[in-house]
Curated annotation (Swiss-Prot):
The modification Phosphoserine is found at S349, S464, S487. GO terms for cellular component: axoneme. Residues 249-288 form the LRRCT domain. The keyword Repeat applies. It comes from Peromyscus californicus (California mouse). Residues 48-59, 337-351 have a biased composition (Low complexity). Residues 32-42, 62-80, 326-336 have a biased composition (Basic and acidic residues). This is Dynein axonemal assembly factor 1. Cilium-specific protein required for the stability of the ciliary architecture. Plays a role in cytoplasmic preassembly of dynein arms. Involved in regulation of microtubule-based cilia and actin-based brush border microvilli. One of its GO terms (biological process) is cilium assembly. It is found in: Cell projection, Cilium. Its main location: other.
Length: 622
């Protein structure tokens, strides 16, 4: 029932057997028996244990190898690779062409790639960005024959290789890698820029290959381990080297007067480390190489004096230009023509002969000043006499308003409506200026009826009209009268629109009717004017009788219908109130009769009859 008891019994059963066996060997001593037992144990245990231990070690090594192999495969599978799908997706992300050959730039930086691959279709690349990856080798760039820029900084490169297909490569950046030797760059015929900062370069032999790069202009060797001053001999063998950066290397401390020495030995250098090499710095460095610090100081003073002189010369040139411009301006203000450049140069030549020669700088200043004036003359050509013409035009514009004002004032006592009544004469006289029209309008607005003369001054006004027309000599009114028997009373009414603003009332009407133009070219040709002239003096005395005896019957009947037949003779008179100064023409005829009489008068103008000429003596003066 109990397993422990059974185990004890089994042990007890085995022990007697051992005792029996020991009893069989009772002839031997106890020590011999112990040794024999130990030997048997060793023979039984020794080989088996060693074989087992070796098997265990082998199995452990195999397990470690299997685990490391699995880890490597997993790492290779987990890392990103340059697959075609990934590259197309990347091109789409950066808004590049899906067609690989059309892309000239490919951005593959910060992607974690460990090798370059699958770029065979990208044959048109000119710039390839592969920085900040895990690339360990330069490879698979055979299709990039048009590549100009290759950026491989911050990778795991140990060697420069496989760059032979890149025959057009211009810039190569291999900074922040583990490169120990510069090599395999002579196959790049147009390589211009090489950046090798933060690498493992140490000796002169590591950079000896740079002497074969004949087109290399920009070289960055900063933050390496270069310590031998003999590297300058390698750099001197580079004919096109312009920019050099050696900061962060021990060699900068091992070369005495580092900057001066490098500047003197590298003749074509224009930029060293963190600042440019100016011509002044190069001259001072060369003077230091010839005569030490004293020569350098003297050379520096000479350069400073030259720079100061150049500044003063430029200021003097500007002052000379300003002075000559002021002289020209004064000459133009005085009305004198400015001297040409040849005379100015001849005038300045005696002064130049008196003064000691200043050298080429003074000649350059003179040439610069002359060139500036020539350019100004070409851009802004000056017209001789232009100011005089402007003055003449200004005088004319000043005189014309005065003349127009005087003419307008002289026309005031004549007839104010000259422009309205004589359109044909105005057309032949020519178009007037806007100033004269404005002044004439102002004078028209200033006319008042109270200022008009009385009817008793008929003879005096006629004389003044003739005198004024002789003085001015410009005809203002051309009279066209139709001496017909039907237009007797309506003649004044038809001429009313022209004469409603006349200053002389009815006498003015008579004077305007028989006014003859003094100009021979514009004289009015009116038939029977000689017959009508004697009656002009007696018109005032017989005017009432003419209207009372010769008034047509239809007019009297029409006015009588309105209830004003008794006062019709008084109303039909032109203007009887001379004392009040209101000389208004009568408007007794209706509009219909006025239109008929105007039409009849226009017909009678063409063919005057002898009967009309006889009756004109009595009725034409109305």
């Amino acid at each position: 029932m109990h397993p422990e008891v059974s185990e004890q019994q089994a042990d007890g059963a085995t022990e007697p057997s051992l005792e029996e066996s020991a009893g069989d060997h009772s002839g031997a001593g106890p020590g011999v028996r112990k040794e024999e037992i130990n030997e048997t144990k060793e023979t039984c245990v020794g080989p088996s244990t060693t074989s087992c231990q070796s098997q265990k070690q082998q199995s452990g090594d195999s397990r470690l190898e299997c685990r490391s192999g699995y880890a490597r495969n997993d790492r290779d599978d987990r890392g990103p690779r340059m697959t075609k799908e990934f590259l197309q997706k990347l091109c789409k992300q950066h808004k590049l062409y899906i067609t690989p050959a059309l892309n000239d730039t490919l951005y593959l930086h910060f992607k974690g790639f460990d090798r370059i691959e699958n770029l065979e279709e990208y044959t048109g690349l000119r710039c390839l960005w592969l920085e900040c990856n895990g690339i360990q080798r330069i490879e698979n760039l055979q299709a990039q024959s048009e590549l100009r820029c290759l950026f491989l900084q911050v990778n795991l490169l140990h060697k420069i290789e496989n760059l032979e297909p890149l025959q057009k490569l211009d810039a190569l950046n291999l900074s922040n890698n583990y490169i120990k030797t510069i090599e395999n760059l002579s196959c790049l015929p147009v390589l211009n820029t090489l950046q090798m900062a933060h690498n493992r370069l140490e000796t002169v032999a590591d950079i000896q290959h740079l002497g074969e790069c004949l087109r290399l202009c920009v070289l960055d060797l900063s933050h390496n381990m270069l310590s031998d001053p003999e590297i300058l001999s390698v750099l001197e063998s580079m004919p096109c080297l312009r920019v050099l950066n050696l900061m962060g290397n021990p060699v900068t401390k091992h070369i005495p007067n580092y900057r001066r020495t490098v500047t003197v030995r590298l003749k074509q250098l224009t930029y060293l480390d963190d600042r440019p090499v100016f011509p002044k710095d190069r001259a001072c460095a060369e003077a230091w190489a010839r005569g030490g610090y004293a020569a350098e100081k003297e050379e520096r003073l000479q350069w400073e004096s030259r720079e100061h002189k150049k500044i003063t010369d430029s200021l003097e040139a500007l002052a000379m230009i300003k002075r000559r411009a002021e002289e020209r301006k004064k000459a133009r203000d005085k009305g004198e023509t400015p001297l040409p450049d040849s005379e100015e140069s001849s005038s300045t030549s005696p002064e130049a002969q008196e003064k000691p020669p200043l050298g080429e700088t003074q000649e350059k200043i003179e040439l610069f000043v002359k060139g500036s004036f020539k350019a100004k003359d070409e851009l802004f050509p000056e017209k001789p006499g232009g100011e005089e013409e402007l003055a003449v035009v200004a005088d004319r514009t000043v005189e014309e308003p005065d003349l127009s004002g005087s003419l307008a004032q002289s026309q005031i006592p004549l007839v104010a409506t000259a422009e309205e009544s004589t359109s044909s004469v105005a057309a032949t006289d020519g178009a007037r200026t806007e100033d004269t029209e404005a002044i004439a309008l102002e004078t028209k607005e200033r006319l008042f009826i109270d200022d008009l003369p009385d009817l008793e001054d008929v003879d005096g006004m006629d004389i003044s009209i003739e005198d004024q027309t002789k003085e001015t000599g410009i005809p203002k009114i051309q009279v066209v009268s139709s001496l017909s028997d039907d237009s007797d009373p309506e003649l004044n009414d038809s001429s009313l629109p022209m004469l409603e603003h006349t200053p002389t009332g009815s006498t003015g009407i008579l004077s305007n009717i028989f006014a003859v133009c003094k100009d021979s070219s514009k004289a009015a040709r009116v038939p029977l004017t000689d017959i009508c002239k004697p009656t002009a003096t007696t018109e005032v005395e017989t005017q009432g009788q003419v209207f009372s005896t010769t008034r047509p019957q239809p007019l009297i009947q029409e006015l009588g219908e309105d209830g004003r037949g008794e006062n019709e003779p008084n109303q039909s008179l032109p203007a009887q109130s001379s004392e009040d100064g209101d000389s208004q023409l009568p408007e007794a005829t209706p509009l219909g009769d006025r239109a008929e009489n105007e039409a009849q008068s226009s017909l009678d103008l063409g063919e005057p009859s002898p009967r009309a000429s006889l009756e004109d003596i009595e009725f034409g003066l109305d």
